Amino acid sequence: MNMRFLYHALYRIVWPFFSLAHPVGARGRENIPEGGAVLCANHSALCDPILVCFACTLRWMVRPMAKIELSRVPALGWLLGKAGVIYVDRGHADVHAVKEALKWLKEGQKLLVFPEGTRVRKGEDVKGKSGAALFATRTG
């Protein structure tokens, strides 16, 4: 199944219902550059990746990075993989995930990274990982 087709289909089917349950506004989309870009976001709720991807509208296809454990969730793991999620094994230096992300960025696309590598609750102090900086410096 074509990744771009599934991404667009999910956007058109899921977003109208999701936005009713979680109304959000997006500001600053005009600051997203053309070409490859690393989008870094806070991650405090389970729905954050969906909200960020859908807030970017269909103008850009945003590929989020997600923990590999999600790939093992029946049906959801398959669907997310087909929609373009780059699974990363946070317990190891995941060379495959890094190469896939760099390739995507070099093709001029958008990559969504949560710098802490996990959800962070309000008041928690979690040190960020170096992945976002690595992607930005390696792709210019």
Can you annotate each of these PLM segments?
Residues 3-7, 11, 18-140:
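Soluble catalytic domains of membrane acyltransferases
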